[in-house]
Amino acid sequence: MINIYTDGSATKSRSGWGWLAVYPEGQQEHESGTSIGATNQRMELMAALRALIWWKREGHCRWDSDDDVTIHTDSAYLYNCWADKWWVKWENNGWRNSQDAPVANMDLWKYLTTFFKDPQVSFAKVKGHSGHVYNEMADKLATGAIKAEEEQWLKIQEKNDKINIELSEILLDYSMKKYPVDETIKRIRKACGC
C-alpha cells in the first residue's frame, strides 16, 4: 500500500499544489507546482491527479500490480466526489451538475474519474491543519511552491525596476543634452544587458 498525501492552496494571485508519497518502508517522493488564478479546490484536484499519474507511471516499473494507493486529502470536495459517487451522476448527466450547469473543473474531474474506477485506488479524508505530519508536509509543498514562485517574480520585478530607473535617468540625461546620441545608446544597451 502506498499512501499519498495531497493538498492545494491559493492566494489572490497564485495557486499551488503538492503531494507526498510514503512507501511502506518509509521512503518518500514528492512533487509540487503552481498555477495563476486557480481556486484552492482546483489545486486540490490537481494535486491528486498529478499524484495518481505519478503512481500509475511508476507503478508499472517499480511495484507489482497488487500495490494499492490511498490518496489522503483534507478536501471535502475531492473526497465526497469519490465517496458519494458524484462523478457517476455527472458522467451519466453529460458532465452537468444537479442545476444542469457544466461541472466545475470538468477537465480535471474527467481524468480523475478514470482513477476512481480503478479498484486499486481509494481515498481517505484527513482533517486539515490538525497536526497530521504528512498532511502538513503536503500543505508546505503547496504553499512553498507559491512562495517560491512569488519570490522569483519579486526578483524579476526588482531587476526590472532597477532597469527602468536607470533608463529614466539615461533619457533624462539625454534630454538635458548631457551625452551625445551614440553615448546614450551605449548606456541604454548596458542598462538592458544587451
For every predicted segment, state its role:
Residues M1, K190-C194:
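Short intrinsically disordered terminal tails
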Residues M1-R42, M46, I53-K56, W82, ...:
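RNase H-like nuclease fold core
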Residues T6-R14, H30, L49-M137, E151:
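RNase H catalytic domain
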Residues Y111, F115, L141, A145, ...:
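Residues that form generic nucleotide/phosphate-binding pockets
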Residues V126-K127, A138, A142-N164:
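A two-mode feature
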Residues K155-K190:
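Charged/polar low-complexity intrinsically disordered segments, enriched in acidic residues
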